Amino acid sequence: MTTILKHLPVGQRIGIAFSGGLDTSAALLWMRQKGAVPYAYTANLGQPDEEDYDAIPRRAMEYGAENARLIDCRKQLVAEGIAAIQCGAFHNTTGGLTYFNTTPLGRAVTGTMLVAAMKEDGVNIWGDGSTYKGNDIERFYRYGLLTNAELQIYKPWLDTDFIDELGGRHEMSEFMIACGFDYKMSVEKAYSTDSNMLGATHEAKDLEYLHSSVKIVNPIMGVKFWDESVKIPAEEVTVRFEQGHPVALNGKTFSDDVEMMLEANRIGGRHGLGMSDQIENRIIEAKSRGIYEAPGMALLHIAYERLLTGIHNEDTIEQYHAHGRQLGRLLYQGRWFDSQALMLRDSLQRWVASQITGEVTLELRRGNDYSILNTVSENLTYKPERLTMEKGDSVFSPDDRIGQLTMRNLDITDTREKLFGYAKTGLLSSSAASGVPQVENLENKGQ
C-alpha cells in the first residue's frame, strides 16, 4: 500500500491537523470542494499566542469539516517536557545557552494523540501543514505510522493541483473570500512563530539571515530583556524537586503539572529567561537558524542540574550529559519513542532522576543572567567539611595524600614515555617553544 498520496483521495475521509490559520482553513475548504471528506483535529498544546481554542473547531465546521475535535494535549506535553529535563535531552547549545527541544516535544505529542483520535473516528489518512524542507514532515510521518500502521499521508502542500490553484497566501485569501468567507490575511511578520506551552520557536523570513538578530523578535513568553527601557527588577525564586519531579515553586506545591509549568513560565518569562539564538542541523543535514523561548523549561533545568551536580558523582554526571545529548538528538529526529530512546530514558530517569530531591534558590535578573543563592538536599554528597581549608579533624591526612600522589608516578611515567615516542616519530617537537612538554631523552641522560 502506498503510504504517501500525491493527489487528493476523492470520496475518502482525511484527517487534517487544523490550526485555524489561513493555510489549513483554505486547505480544508479546498478538499471539501474537490470531493474529499475532511475531518479536523486541533491540538490544545497551551499555545501562549492562542486566545480561544473552542472557536477553532467551530470554524472548521463552517469551512466544510465533516467533524471537528479539540484534543487536549497539555498534560501529556508537560509530562514529556519534564522527562526531557530529567534526562537532559538537549543537544543544541550555543555559548552555554540551551535549546530545550520544545518543538520536537510538541510534535511527539501531537503526532501520536491526533492520529490516535483519527483512528477512533475511522480516519486513516492524515494531512498537516509541514513542508518538505523541514523537520516536521519526518517527525509527523514517524509518529503517525507508529500510532496507526494503516495510516496514509496526504499533504495539500505536496499536491501539484493544490499548489497550482492556491500556491500562496494571497491566493488562499482570495479563495476564501470568493467562497463567502471574509478571511483577511494577518499582518505579515518578519519571521514565523510556532509555539506550545513549553516554548516558542521564531524562524524563517528575515531570521534566515544572520545579520537579523534577536532584537527583531517580539517575545510571546517573555520580555525584551535587551531593551534598556524595559524595567526588569531582580527576583528570588525557589524551585523544589522530589525524586526528579518539580513539585513546588516559591513554596507553593502543585498537584497539577500543567499549572506548575504555567507558573514556571510566568516567573521565568518576567525576565526573558531561556531565550536563545541557535544555528542547528536539520534532519536532512542542512543548517537552519531559530530563536527560541522556554522560560519555564530553563528555570526547571537550572535548578535540576544544580541538584544533579551536588548529588551524583563525576562519572554519573558525565553519563547524564553524554546520554542526554544522544537522547536529545533522537528527540529532534522524531525518534522519542524508538527503542534506543526508551532505553536511554529509562536508565536516566531510574538511576539519575530518582535521587534528585531538594530545593534551589535563584536570583533572576535580565535574560539569562542569574545567580544561585542556595542549594538544599538531604541527598547531597557535597560536604564542605571534607575539604575545608580550616584546621580540624579531616577524613584523610597529609600522609594519605602523599601515598595517593606516589601512586600517580605509574601513569605519569607511562605518559612521559609516550610523549618521547611521539617526539621520536616527529609528531611532537622536543622544543619547549612548541608549547608541549619538553621531552628529555632519558636513555642518553648519562652520556
Curated annotation (Swiss-Prot):
Compartments, record wording: Cytoplasm
One family name in Pfam for this protein: Arginosuc_syn_C
Entry keyword Hydrolase: no
Binding site for L-aspartate: T131, N135, D136
Primary localization: cytoplasm
Top enzyme class: ligase
UniProt binding sites for ATP: A17, F18, S19, G20, G21, L22, D23, T24, S25, A43, G129, T131, D136, D194
UniProt keyword list: Amino-acid biosynthesis, Arginine biosynthesis, ATP-binding, Cytoplasm, Ligase, Nucleotide-binding
EC number, as in UniProt: 6.3.4.5
Protein name in the entry: Argininosuccinate synthase
Gene that encodes it: argG
